[in-house]
Amino acid sequence: SDVLAEILNHADGVAVAGAHGKTTTSAMISCIAAASDIDPTIIIGGEVGSLGGNARNGAGSYVVAEADESDGSFLKFYPKYAIVTNIENDHMDHYGSEENIYLAFTEFLSNVKEGGAAILCMDSPKLRKLASETTTPVISYGLEHEDARYQARNIRYSVNGTCYDLYVDGVFVSTVELIVPGQHNVLNSLGAIATAQAMGIPMQQILPALKKFSGARRRFETKGRIDGIW
């Protein structure tokens, strides 16, 4: 964690934390960034086929990393963009109380560099509370909270994946197509889109990259089909 913090803190860091979804969200951000013009460095927790692994050495200013909150080591990070997918009562062996978990994420957001932002999922009650209390600028996303800046509406599921209508600040932007299934991946993709836009990546580069994203290894990974059963 010390080496990762050293790399991220001397760059335009993008750090993804949360009880669930951080590996897939960081993988989505990584694939979008790698397909864009910004040439990022990537250090994440899951292997991604299109990246050829879980790391990439880029020449650009951005470093995308997964921030592990389980032992508090994510507080060593001072990112430009801090993404939090959710906060739950997890890792109690380290934190000891619900309040300590919340305080750790409060500190994580306070570490965001000037000119950066916290990108938070408003479907998490604790993140809604944190968004109202932090002095760090917030970019919000979600399915259930009407005040979220990035929203997915009219979600359609099929055997081929998922698609939805993307709204930003209440305005329809585009239809998003994913080949990874499930509502959780709709949320993950919203966080990735919000982050990529904050990084300056145009939507015409974001959406094609997301459409090709096939998931991170060991995250609802398709292994085969036998007698019609996947």
Task: Please provide the spans of the model-predicted regions.
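Adenine nucleotide phosphate-binding catalytic loops in nucleotide-utilizing enzymes
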Residues: Y95-Y102, G116, S132, T136-W230
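Phosphate-binding loop of NTP-binding sites
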Residues: S1-M122, K126-T136, L190, A194-M199, ...
